[in-house]
Amino acid sequence: MILVMSKPLPLSGSEPNYTQRLWGRTVGVGNNNCYAYAVGDYEKMRLQKSVPGERAGIRNLSHTYTNCKGLPQRVIADNPKKVYTAKATEKCKPNHFKVMMFVAPGNQRNYFRQGDFHFYKQHGAVEYKVKKGNTYENIAKFFKVR
Protein backbone atom coordinates (compact mmCIF):
# COMPACT_ATOMS: atom_id res chain seq x y z
CA MET A 1 0.00 0.00 0.00
CA ILE A 2 1.31 3.44 -0.89
CA LEU A 3 0.18 6.36 1.25
CA VAL A 4 0.52 9.78 -0.33
CA MET A 5 -0.28 12.72 1.92
CA SER A 6 -1.16 16.02 0.31
CA LYS A 7 -1.38 17.91 3.60
CA PRO A 8 0.12 17.45 7.08
CA LEU A 9 -1.59 15.11 9.51
CA PRO A 10 -3.50 16.99 12.24
CA LEU A 11 -1.82 17.49 15.60
CA SER A 12 -3.48 17.01 18.99
CA GLY A 13 -1.15 19.46 20.74
CA SER A 14 0.22 16.63 22.90
CA GLU A 15 2.96 15.54 20.51
CA PRO A 16 6.41 15.39 22.08
CA ASN A 17 9.18 17.55 20.69
CA TYR A 18 11.81 15.64 18.74
CA THR A 19 15.16 15.70 20.50
CA GLN A 20 18.27 13.56 20.38
CA ARG A 21 19.18 14.20 24.03
CA LEU A 22 18.19 10.74 25.29
CA TRP A 23 17.32 8.51 22.36
CA GLY A 24 20.00 9.84 20.00
CA ARG A 25 22.95 9.03 22.23
CA THR A 26 25.01 5.85 21.90
CA VAL A 27 23.15 4.03 24.70
CA GLY A 28 19.76 5.08 23.34
CA VAL A 29 20.52 4.04 19.77
CA GLY A 30 22.32 0.83 20.74
CA ASN A 31 19.63 -0.52 23.07
CA ASN A 32 16.35 0.73 21.67
CA ASN A 33 14.60 0.46 18.33
CA CYS A 34 11.80 2.31 16.53
CA TYR A 35 9.06 0.45 18.45
CA ALA A 36 10.59 1.27 21.83
CA TYR A 37 11.01 4.90 20.74
CA ALA A 38 7.46 5.21 19.40
CA VAL A 39 5.85 4.00 22.64
CA GLY A 40 8.39 5.58 25.04
CA ASP A 41 9.92 2.31 26.25
CA TYR A 42 13.51 3.50 26.81
CA GLU A 43 15.96 1.04 28.34
CA LYS A 44 19.68 1.50 28.98
CA MET A 45 20.32 -2.19 28.31
CA ARG A 46 18.24 -4.43 26.07
CA LEU A 47 19.42 -7.84 24.86
CA GLN A 48 17.21 -7.94 21.77
CA LYS A 49 15.06 -5.52 19.84
CA SER A 50 11.69 -4.65 21.32
CA VAL A 51 8.77 -6.26 19.47
CA PRO A 52 5.00 -5.76 19.75
CA GLY A 53 3.46 -8.06 22.36
CA GLU A 54 6.69 -8.66 24.29
CA ARG A 55 5.80 -6.48 27.30
CA ALA A 56 2.33 -8.06 27.49
CA GLY A 57 3.89 -11.53 27.55
CA ILE A 58 2.46 -12.58 24.19
CA ARG A 59 4.65 -15.27 22.71
CA ASN A 60 6.02 -14.45 19.29
CA LEU A 61 7.19 -17.88 18.15
CA SER A 62 4.90 -17.96 15.13
CA HIS A 63 4.86 -14.26 14.20
CA THR A 64 7.42 -13.04 11.66
CA TYR A 65 6.50 -9.34 12.03
CA THR A 66 6.31 -9.12 8.23
CA ASN A 67 2.51 -8.76 8.08
CA CYS A 68 -0.03 -6.71 10.03
CA LYS A 69 -2.04 -9.65 11.37
CA GLY A 70 -2.46 -9.17 15.11
CA LEU A 71 0.19 -6.45 15.44
CA PRO A 72 -2.13 -3.58 16.44
CA GLN A 73 -3.60 -5.78 19.19
CA ARG A 74 -0.08 -6.59 20.42
CA VAL A 75 0.84 -2.89 20.56
CA ILE A 76 -2.33 -2.12 22.53
CA ALA A 77 -1.69 -5.07 24.88
CA ASP A 78 1.81 -3.71 25.59
CA ASN A 79 0.48 -0.20 26.26
CA PRO A 80 -3.13 -0.55 27.45
CA LYS A 81 -3.49 2.96 28.92
CA LYS A 82 -1.40 4.81 26.33
CA VAL A 83 -2.56 3.45 22.96
CA TYR A 84 -5.78 3.23 20.97
CA THR A 85 -6.46 2.84 17.25
CA ALA A 86 -7.30 5.92 15.19
CA LYS A 87 -7.26 7.06 11.59
CA ALA A 88 -4.19 8.95 10.41
CA THR A 89 -6.30 11.90 9.28
CA GLU A 90 -8.08 12.48 12.60
CA LYS A 91 -6.84 14.48 15.55
CA CYS A 92 -5.85 12.35 18.56
CA LYS A 93 -7.53 12.52 21.95
CA PRO A 94 -5.95 14.93 24.46
CA ASN A 95 -2.62 13.66 25.86
CA HIS A 96 -2.12 11.31 22.89
CA PHE A 97 -0.10 11.47 19.67
CA LYS A 98 0.13 9.39 16.51
CA VAL A 99 2.36 6.38 16.03
CA MET A 100 2.26 4.56 12.71
CA MET A 101 3.39 1.03 12.05
CA PHE A 102 4.59 -0.27 8.69
CA VAL A 103 5.66 -3.76 7.66
CA ALA A 104 7.81 -4.96 4.78
CA PRO A 105 6.87 -8.51 3.83
CA GLY A 106 10.25 -9.27 2.27
CA ASN A 107 11.16 -12.50 0.53
CA GLN A 108 11.42 -15.60 2.74
CA ARG A 109 13.76 -17.28 0.23
CA ASN A 110 16.28 -14.43 0.35
CA TYR A 111 18.24 -14.24 3.64
CA PHE A 112 19.00 -10.53 3.18
CA ARG A 113 15.40 -9.50 2.33
CA GLN A 114 13.31 -11.25 4.98
CA GLY A 115 11.17 -8.25 5.84
CA ASP A 116 10.69 -6.28 9.02
CA PHE A 117 8.50 -3.71 10.78
CA HIS A 118 9.08 -0.03 11.39
CA PHE A 119 7.34 2.56 13.59
CA TYR A 120 7.10 6.30 13.10
CA LYS A 121 6.14 8.81 15.80
CA GLN A 122 4.49 12.16 15.06
CA HIS A 123 6.23 15.17 16.60
CA GLY A 124 4.92 18.66 17.11
CA ALA A 125 8.32 20.40 16.96
CA VAL A 126 11.95 19.51 16.43
CA GLU A 127 14.82 20.55 18.66
CA TYR A 128 17.86 21.06 16.44
CA LYS A 129 21.30 21.87 17.78
CA VAL A 130 23.14 24.07 15.31
CA LYS A 131 26.59 22.69 14.59
CA LYS A 132 29.72 24.56 13.59
CA GLY A 133 29.75 24.95 9.83
CA ASN A 134 25.96 24.69 9.40
CA THR A 135 24.52 26.89 6.70
CA TYR A 136 20.94 27.93 6.03
CA GLU A 137 21.03 25.61 3.03
CA ASN A 138 22.07 22.42 4.87
CA ILE A 139 19.70 23.11 7.78
CA ALA A 140 16.87 23.56 5.26
CA LYS A 141 17.95 20.33 3.56
CA PHE A 142 17.92 18.48 6.93
CA PHE A 143 14.32 19.60 7.51
CA LYS A 144 13.41 19.04 3.85
CA VAL A 145 12.43 22.68 3.41
CA ARG A 146 13.03 24.36 0.07
Regions found by a protein language model. Give the residues of each.
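Cysteine-nucleophile protease catalytic domains, especially the papain-like/related folds used
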Residues: 2-82
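...with weaker cross-activation on analogous glycine-rich loops/strands in unrelated enzymes
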Residues: 63-125
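Short amphipathic alpha-helical segments with coiled-coil-like heptad repeat character
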Residues: 46-48, 124-125, 129
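Primarily a LysM-type cell-wall glycan-binding module
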Residues: 126-146
